[in-house]
Amino acid sequence: MIKSYLGIDIGSISTKGVIIDENNNILASSYLWTKGNPINAVKEVINELHNKIKGKAIKIVSVGTTGSARKLIGTILNASIIKNE
């Protein structure tokens, strides 16, 4: 099982997500428009990331959020890090 970390940047214009391993290698990434709805944008980013890692032995051990909706999404995802840019 590969220990990995999920990072999400939820901005007013775009939402970006990345999954990295312990050596900072990017395992999957996603970039979508927020379209004024950060919750739906994050759902789409997570679905896209999930599809990219499907079938791989990856375990997300920590989540971090940043961006204008960092507190909202960080609370929803129970993020260990909610960081202002």
Q: What are these language model-derived features?
A:
Residues 45-53:
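Stable alpha-helical structural segments in soluble proteins, enriched in small hydrophobic residues
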Residues 30-34, 53-85:
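Short beta-strand-loop/turn "lid" adjacent to the catalytic site in phosphate-handling enzymes
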Residues 23-25, 47, 75, 80-81:
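Hydrophobic alpha-helical segments
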